[in-house]
Amino acid sequence: MTSRKRLVFSYCCLALLLAMLFAVSLFWGSVALTPQAVLAALTGRGQDALSVGIITQLRLPRAVMAVLLGAALSAAGYLLQTFFANPIAGPFVMGISSGAKLAVALVMVLFLNYGLLTSSAVLILAAFAGAMAAMAFVLAAARRVQRMSILVICGVMIGYICSAITEFVVAFAQDSSIVNLHNWSQGSFSGMTWGNVRTAALVVLPALAAAFCLAKPMAAYQMGEAYARSVGVDVRRFSRLLVLLSSLLAACVTAFAGPISFVGIAVPHLVKQLLGSARPLYVLPGCCLGGAAFCLLCDLIARSLFAPMELSISCLLYTSPSPRDS
């Protein structure tokens, strides 16, 4: 099979898998619905108010969010692996998700303690600030160390420090804050609303579009900084954009679904193996499709395995051997 045919075949397989999982997620759950009932609800011809509400207000926004956030997390992992030239770099390993988790935890505890409501925009801003702070520490360490293995250790250490501070914050939180924070910190796509979908789409889609625009400079950067400069890439500006985009994508995922590990590390490697190519122009779309399908599958298993009881995403991913947060 030629490389072009392999790419087309791989994209078709990923798109078909994503479409199948999306469809199954709409009619499979604690309340079983037939495909006919799902189609009727989606086209506005549903007669049963209960089934229409389950589809349009619960399962559909949840599935859309799983697609958006799965694509964002996988793309963030690939951007970080490209930037650090390290195959195990990812939002969790580099401490970005832990920094975002700490910032969101602080906002949730402080706001709930004073009886204030936390909007999606506030959580995203807090998560982005925490992610950028953690990334700043990693970049500061990168200037002082030469070996990538030491840099990864620095990222892991920052992650553990952020997790320790998060636990310290929780120790002084009110009971209601602890419950909300615990449920969120396990990682889940439950409780998503159309308002969440709109906010996430406003963040994720432009960030992914910007990442696609950087595909050509990324290909040059993979050949080394010297080569990238020789072909006209502003490495400093490019690096800043890469850091901002990866942090923003990881922060958005953490703000809405909590800290989710493994996806940002594993999916880019699986996609590259499937496509037989490491070119960013080909890998980025594959990462988005693969990450979306992977998160849909995990969410489907989490809410269906022991229905009506629902598992967290982390409960499933922690069974996989991968670098992860505490």
Regions found by a protein language model. Name each.
Residues 1-326:
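Alpha-helical transmembrane segments in inner-membrane proteins
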